[in-house]
């Protein structure tokens, strides 16, 4: 199991008994953590149906994970929202959103304005189809590489599978403010990747245990990051 590291030295581990190991546990945790309305449950169910159908046309998620889609993808995404419980309506930017994980799950469970950044056309077509089908008026899809997305202050930045950690942070630093919350699932390499960051960046983050995988961690941080200085051309 990942051993979480906090800047304040406190514990934040998830016990083996609390891990969401199956679909029933995942649904139960979603109910307990977010108390979704009937409409939200219907939206999540519809999203799952659309995701599975689209996965037969383009590779959005590993086919082997479909039988456990509620634990492996829905609860796995929703746990990021549980790590940012601050009140308010600040912009949430989801980088490399792919099939909308975690962005669309977060958007269904909250009213936070959501920007899904994805450069691949077919994935963006799917994202737009889901947004329209579920009437998620607070969600915007940016079909472009991150480097071409206009700078906007983000209350939250997430990235489930986007780029190596140092590059991810450097590319997205311009969206950060003093209060930005960073939520970066990094799998089994979370502690190792954190240790490789520049010292000032390391101090901003700690590792939270994933609720869906005993070997995975989520980097959680708060604050503004200055982009790396570029050499002159």
Swiss-Prot record:
It is found in: Cytoplasm. One of its GO terms (cellular component) is cytosol. Its EC number is 2.1.1.170. The keyword Transferase applies. InterPro entries: rRNA_ssu_MeTfrase_G, SAM-dependent_MTases_sf. Its main location: cytoplasm. It catalyses: guanosine(527) in 16S rRNA + S-adenosyl-L-methionine = N(7)-methylguanosine(527) in 16S rRNA + S-adenosyl-L-homocysteine. S-adenosyl-L-methionine binds at residues 96, 101, 146-147, 160. It holds the Pfam family GidB. Keywords: Cytoplasm, Methyltransferase, rRNA processing, S-adenosyl-L-methionine, Transferase. GO terms for molecular function: rRNA (guanine-N7-)-methyltransferase activity. PANTHER family: S-ADENOSYL-L-METHIONINE-DEPENDENT METHYLTRANSFERASES SUPERFAMILY PROTEIN. Specifically methylates the N7 position of guanine in position 527 of 16S rRNA. Belongs to the methyltransferase superfamily. RNA methyltransferase RsmG family. HAMAP family: 16SrRNA_methyltr_G. This is Ribosomal RNA small subunit methyltransferase G.
């Amino acid at each position: 199991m990942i051993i979480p590291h906090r800047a304040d030295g406190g514990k934040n581990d998830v016990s083996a008994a609390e891990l969401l190991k199956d679909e029933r546990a995942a649904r139960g945790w979603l109910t307990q953590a977010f108390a979704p309305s009937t409409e939200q449950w219907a939206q999540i169910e519809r999203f799952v149906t659309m995701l599975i159908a689209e996965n037969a046309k383009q590779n959005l998620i590993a086919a082997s994970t479909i039988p456990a889609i509620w634990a492996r993808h829905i609860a796995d995404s929703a746990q990021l929202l549980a790590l940012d419980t601050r009140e308010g309506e600040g912009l949430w930017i989801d980088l490399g959103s792919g099939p909308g994980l975690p962005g669309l799950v977060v958007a269904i469970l909250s009213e936070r304005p959501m920007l899904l950044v994805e450069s691949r056309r077919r994935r963006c077509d799917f994202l737009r189809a889901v947004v329209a089908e579920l009437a998620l008026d607070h969600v915007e899809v940016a079909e472009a590489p991150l480097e071409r997305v206009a700078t906007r202050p983000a209350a939250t930045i997430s990235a489930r599978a986007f780029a190596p950690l140092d590059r991810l942070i450097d590319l997205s630093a311009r969206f950060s403010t003093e209060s930005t919350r960073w939520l970066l699932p990094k799998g089994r390499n979370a502690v190792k990747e954190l240790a490789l960051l520049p010292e000032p960046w390391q101090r901003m983050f700690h590792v939270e245990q994933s609720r869906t995988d005993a070997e995975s961690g989520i980097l959680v941080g708060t604050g503004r990051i200055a982009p790396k200085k570029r050499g002159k051309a």
